[in-house]
């Protein structure tokens, strides 16, 4: 079977508190982006194999989240066959898009179907939580209000159908450690903003990491400014960066489109996606 692990963006991201275990409690809105995805093919086989192409995954095979997920399921559920995995990496690293977490979650979905494990989405989400804080979100893969370390999820009604999204990522990435290095914790979450009807309050959805990341990587802040100048009604860095996205009213005959063409030409090598939201894939 073939799956297409997609990425996500964050609408707002508040760092609420540092926990005793060293992690941080967050509040954010996760939004799936189906148009930018990796490719994952998993089939039963007599011998185990893993073939990877696309963007180079710079880690030992045993540290790859796809392999970790398979190892976890093979041991816990005594899977009765080995598998062959073909994987193409398209979602960049250090981008704030959750690509690795999505790969692990979709691997779990594949194993659940291939081996007829009968696990519910809630059970799958619990299984993948230890692989990455964002992993449970990709099991549901619809807009969610996220709390805790990103693992406490509440699906929300978010209508972005017809909205145009432009995603730009500079060559430089941002490590999670770097993003947290100078963060100021205010203790303020999203509050009522995280509830249905958020589109009218989008400009209040700020990303706390921007205050840390923009001074260290001025190009990221410049991209956000340029998106707004080009007519985006909302723009933000996603997660801990370095991807920045802008929402536009889909008006191809208007002046916004002319400004967007200029912007896309200037940042041509950095554009990850220019797409329009459709229906959510529940």
Segments (PLM) and residue ranges:
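Short, basic/glycine-rich phosphate-binding loops at helix/coil junctions
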Residues: 46-59, 107, 129, 198-206
């Amino acid at each position: 079977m073939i799956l297409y692990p997609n990425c996500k963006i964050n609408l707002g991201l508040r760092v609420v508190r540092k926990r005793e275990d060293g992690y941080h409690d967050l509040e954010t809105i996760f939004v799936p982006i189906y148009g930018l995805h990796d490719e994952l093919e998993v089939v039963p086989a007599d011998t185990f194999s893993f073939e990877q192409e696309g963007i180079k995954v710079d880690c030992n095979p045993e540290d790859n989240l796809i392999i970790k997920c398979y190892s976890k399921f093979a041991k816990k559920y005594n899977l009765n066959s080995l598998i062959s995995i073909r994987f193409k990496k398209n979602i960049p690293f250090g981008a704030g898009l959750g690509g690795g977490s999505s790969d692990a979650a979709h691997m779990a979905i594949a194993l659940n179907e291939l081996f007829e494990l009968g696990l519910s989405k809630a059970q799958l989400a619990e299984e993948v939580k230890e692989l990455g804080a964002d992993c449970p979100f990709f099991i549901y893969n619809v807009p969610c209000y996220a709390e805790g370390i990103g693992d406490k999820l509440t699906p929300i009604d978010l209508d972005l159908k017809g909205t145009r999204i432009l995603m730009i990522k500079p060559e430089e990435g941002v490590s999670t450690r770097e993003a947290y290095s100078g963060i100021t914790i205010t203790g303020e979450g999203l509050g009522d903003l995280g509830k249905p009807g958020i589109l009218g309050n989008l400009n209040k959805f700020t990303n706390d990491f921007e205050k840390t990341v923009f001074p260290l990587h001025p190009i990221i802040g410049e991209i956000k400014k340029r998106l707004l100048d080009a007519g985006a009604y909302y723009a933000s860095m996603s997660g801990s960066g370095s991807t920045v996205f802008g929402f536009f009213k889909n008006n191809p005959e208007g002046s916004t489109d002319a400004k967007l063409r200029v912007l896309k030409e200037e940042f041509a090598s950095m554009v990850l996606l220019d797409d329009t939201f459709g229906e959510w894939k529940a």
